[in-house]
Amino acid sequence: MKMTNRKDIEQVLWNACDSFRGKIDSSRYKDYILSMLFVKYLSDVSKERREEYTKQYDGDMRRVERAMSRERFAMDEQSTFDYLYANRNDAEIGQKINVALNHIEEHNSGKLRNVFRAIDFNSQVDFGEPKEKNATLRNLLEDFNGLDLRPSQLGSADIIGDAYEYMIAMFASDAGKKGGEFFTPSQVSELVASLVQSKENDRIYDPTCGSGGLLLKAYKKVPSGKVAIYGQELNAQTWALCTMNMFLHGVDDARIWQGDTLSNPQNVEDDNLMKFQVVVANPPFSLDKWDSGFLSEAEADSKGKKKMSAELDQYHRFDWGVPPTSKGDYAFVLHMLSSLDAENGRMAVVLPHGVLFRGASEGKIRRQLVEMNLLDAVIGLPANLFYGTGIPACILVFKKNRTCRDVLFIDASGDGNFEKGKNQNILRDSDITRIVNSYQARQNEDKYSYVASFDEIKENDFNLNIPRYVDTFEEEELVDIDEVQRNIATIEAELAEVQAQMKGYLKELGL
């Protein structure tokens, strides 16, 4: 029997997309397709395990059921893909799918509670009238029916999870700017994970985890898998994608919370923020009104306007300064630092370049981060790496308990440090390796990296703009004016000769 490979899964997913194209926007139908893939995977795994136990216990169903109750997840018959496929022509198939999803949640409430709450396979808004809806859902079930996702038929344990992430990436690309809200390009995630280097027994946290790709990259740096994964995501649909993504990669014990990380952080133990050895994030760039969740407790000024203050945050994250309402970059940075382990905390965050040089409250915060010896490196990335925005970004690396006071600056934005793509630029493996090696070596490299002392940064008034430290200026070749004039004279002589010839030809023609 032919093994199922990643291309097989991707082809089925693309066929499923065809069932929706022209009817629903991809930002919506991605949730239906990825949810159905999840159901098919759970069903096939459950079916194979049941078959194995039935054979092992000679058909003793009591022992089979006892063994099944100890599996990763539970499914009843009416929740399985096979049941749904058998009822694909039912006039109420949309409702049957909804009921199946509800049962899966109920039977696995510890791991999958609310994961399908934003999905409605009976939606008239998305699917139209019953006849159209039933035809679309029938096609969707038929698309997935030929896909065998039993573990014994998958070439490796990572195939299903990798295919799921591939489709998330494709949907993110199609969604443009919106795609950047739930997916970080794989190469950027790989770079961030390589910079923080997760170790066994680390607790890893992403406060704006999107669909979970960055967390998974950090997780995979530890072959034994002996790490604890935590994340929080504001968008309910994206939170569901992340929860399923973790499950498909075998990270069943990941704790992924849903809610506003800034105004309602869930990483709380005994009324204090939890601490993590590794914190990574690609938060929304320059988030406007980031403080809106705090303002209900704020007092209005004489003009009736409410303003954020450090006292409104019970976790004291903004004691070093309150970022401007219109730019939430440092709000996320301060939250991450407040969640970082004091002994061995490592942190890498993707941010717009404005955080390096903007003034006012951001300048004061930046100064304190350097003075407190928390900033370890500033890495400039090429432009156009991210979905929906061409602006260049940087990675700030922070460490607790640093023994030196210098800061490494790397400018990896220039030509030769990336591959130019049709719609997006791409970091190649060699580009990532060069950045990581340079970060670990902490040495000066002409037009690429520079180790700046604290005094140098202080002299620059704590402005961290990379060109102040890494000189990438290419001197233009000196122009030999005499040679240029000689070339002009030669060209003019040749032109005069050609013009004379042309006049002769015209005269011969009587023109």
How would you label these PLM feature ranges?
Residues 1-196, 200, 255-266, 270, ...:
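Non-catalytic, mostly N-terminal accessory regions of nucleic-acid modification and defense proteins
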Residues 178-281, 285-297, 301-302, 351-354, ...:
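Conserved S-adenosyl-L-methionine
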